[in-house]
């Protein structure tokens, strides 16, 4: 009636460890064991690789009592899928087609550029770990295959890929219409300008000049290569932009207006996250028990182990926690509920 369509968030890099496929794999079904990335330990009994989980700790967990390990780049309850298995890709194509038949008009694919793990997984050396599983060349083949088997058969479907640590060059490949991959991509470099030496869980003011440089690099580069940006400040994994990049205490209207104008006047498609339209800010919880985000709890524990006081650790958690964007609408008992 109002011309509003629905976009679904598709998590195709991993499944829950309570998923039917993983349960069958644990029960000994070898067909479903090949749906996941399961490896023997090294000869010395150590983990298959020295990779780290993005949520802290190791990226491998015991696969039942088999003596093997399964890969989880994220939480231990999120087992990475083996996209090199054609059956896995066919299953995921069916999922997309199921929702297309229901009338869904858009898909946001979670961490899609991480699906191309190599057959032979090797240890990382220094800072090269992400390159071992990010933007591997075969990812483009997988996306084109998914495109041609599902959403690419229709003309009015929007797709956006969440691309972790990608490059402008790959962003163009993912989103140039001639490539038959995706409509656009989310990149996150502009949201790392308050990371110290690339580390998220640090107390670091954002670098305005670096932010400006990154926005310009992606605007110019994607335009030159006929790629397409998804423009955003906020999502379910980020702190509130008003608190992060502005001064919502003294200049709430100016802060929200400045940030909105930035993404609405650039080349690309703007995305608005719930609460952004009313200028929501970070909550101000003083205790880690008020947070539910597993990444925040892991970070708090590691910060304390590194010697920080509770107050110092909480200052960082307050700034960087994903729960900043996951709180309810901030209303009160005043006129118009405070809006």
Regions found by a protein language model. Give the residues of each.
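Active-site and adjacent substrate-binding regions of carbohydrate-active enzymes
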Residues: 1-339
């Amino acid at each position: 009636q109002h011309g509003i369509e629905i976009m679904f968030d598709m998590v195709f890099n991993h499944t829950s460890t309570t998923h039917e496929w993983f349960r069958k794999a644990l029960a000994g079904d070898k067909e479903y064991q090949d749906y996941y990335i399961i490896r023997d330990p090294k000869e010395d009994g150590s983990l298959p690789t020295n990779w780290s989980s993005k949520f802290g700790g190791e990226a491998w967990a015991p696969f039942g009592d088999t003596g093997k390990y399964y890969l989880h780049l994220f939480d231990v309850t999120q087992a990475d899928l083996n996209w090199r298995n054609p059956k896995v890709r066919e299953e995921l194509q069916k999922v997309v087609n199921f929702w297309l038949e229901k009338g869904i008009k858009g898909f946001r694919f979670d961490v899609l550029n991480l699906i191309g793990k190599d057959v032979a997984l090797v240890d990382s050396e220094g800072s090269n770990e992400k390159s071992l599983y990010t933007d591997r060349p075969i990812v483009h083949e997988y996306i084109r295959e998914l495109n041609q088997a599902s959403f690419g058969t229709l003309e009015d479907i929007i797709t956006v890929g969440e691309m972790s640590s990608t490059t402008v060059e790959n962003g163009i490949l993912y989103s140039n219409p001639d490539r038959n991959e995706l409509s656009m991509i989310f990149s996150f470099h502009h949201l790392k300008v308050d990371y110290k030496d690339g580390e998220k869980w640090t107390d670091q003011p954002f670098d305005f000049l670096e932010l400006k440089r990154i926005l310009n690099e992606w605007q110019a580069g994607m335009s030159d290569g006929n790629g397409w940006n998804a423009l955003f400040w906020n999502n379910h994994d980020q702190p509130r932009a008003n608190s992060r990049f502005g001064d919502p205490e003294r200049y709430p209207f100016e802060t929200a207006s400045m940030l909105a104008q930035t993404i609405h006047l650039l080349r690309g498609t703007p995305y608005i996250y719930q609460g952004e339209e009313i200028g929501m800010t970070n909550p101000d919880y003083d205790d880690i028990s008020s947070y539910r985000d597993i990444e925040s709890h892991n970070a708090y524990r590691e910060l304390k182990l590194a010697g920080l006081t509770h107050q110092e650790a909480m200052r960082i958690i307050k700034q960087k926690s994903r729960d900043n964007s996951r709180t309810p609408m901030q209303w009160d008992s005043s006129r118009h509920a405070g809006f």
